[in-house]
Amino acid sequence: IENAESLGIDPDAIVVSGSSAGAITVLQAEWEICNGRQLASVLPDGFNYAGVMSFSGAIFPRQGGIRYGMEPCPMMLCHGTADKIVPYGQIWFFNIRFAGSSVISRTLRRKGYNYRFFRFEGNSHEIASTMCHNFDREMDFLEENVMKGRRVIIDTTLADDGVPVPDWAKGGDYRKLYNKD
């Protein structure tokens, strides 16, 4: 951010996106910023992203429920309801909550924050590799929610058999990571 001018970057127009661990990173970064956490102290006062796009992401809130001390930037969440690698709902690691997109969206909806959530019914972690598959949804989110600043809230479940399954997901063994099914 300190080199934004020399790089020709508008710091007010930065949108971050990630899938799986990258989605966890971008969602956690936004949570840290909105809650004034120590990790966000390296950023300029008042900085926030213009938007966040997450494909199979979650956060570690560490204390209590999912709360945002200030309104988060517009968020687009995509997650498979049967994800066993990054939880769609929530799990606990050593008394630390790992809250997925379904839990995050409840807070966003309850507070009336600017977000879109696309739940892929029955899909698993392959949603982490669907950035190209969701291109039209991404472009609409970027144009309407981010660039125009419109509060377009979408929270929907999709039954999409056309979601491509990457080679690493075809065997199904990855689904047994922390569940017995």
Model-identified regions with their sequence ranges:
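Hydrophobic anchor at the start of a short beta-strand
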Residues: I14, M75, N114-Y115
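Gram-negative outer-membrane beta-barrel domains
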Residues: L7, S19-A21, K84, G100-T107, ...
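Glycine-rich, phosphate-binding/catalytic loops in enzymes
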Residues: E32-C34, G69-E71, W92-R97, D136
